[in-house]
């Protein structure tokens, strides 16, 4: 009996020590950085407040709108925007992400918000540059508003048969649950920050592979994309993504807007076959297969800028 009691006490001590260790790690290694203040501007679009950064440009090229993925912020284009000096360039925080409010905003409502934002900012016939799910948004906009976009640069776009699996959906459900007010408060005080940091580290490694993770991007994801509103938007989009991508894929042949598909040949999130299929299905598209993973805005900003230049200089007879 004494041995059993001793074993129970020992187990209790071990479990208590583990619990304390997790809490300590939660507030040391796992502690999330403070959210920095926004540096861009805001536009009121319906019930949404959209954050954007503008680079005026002066070369007379077509206006350019940079649309981040899932998740993301305007900062994802920090290496691309300076290369577009000949264009008025606007990088947006999609509704629900970055500093744009709204939590989860459904796909169709995002397209409407983009259209209204363009009117508000006097953006006419822009070239849309969409990364990952931002590419899906760009395709959706071109399909819903034919003739409004001059061209599309689709960077590792979530299309061409892209389909998330059970793990991604389970993760999204878990993230959604963890944003419940009381749950989030308890988790953040005990283990939530540690779990978030470990999860982000793993996802970042996968996204940047075979290149190294860019430190400034990693910190920005932790500081901005891990806030409650951003995570609500992330979970909602992840759960809706399969249906949205399937819907867009069915309509690809109707999109007459000229497009350049930029695809990483080692992308682990959007496989190269997806990019090939997308480029082959769109009526007026060409494929640029580049070395690298999913984060082409960091690894190949010059290639993205060159694609913008090519679309800006091209005739627009097929745009529509």
List the model feature ranges, each with a label:
Residues 53-56, 91-133, 145:
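Active-site loop/oxyanion-hole signature of alpha/beta-hydrolase fold enzymes
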Residues 284-320:
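Catalytic active-site module of serine/aspartate enzymes centered on a nucleophile-bearing elbow/loop
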Residues 48, 54-99:
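Conserved HGGG/HGGXW glycine-rich cap/lid loop of the alpha/beta-hydrolase fold
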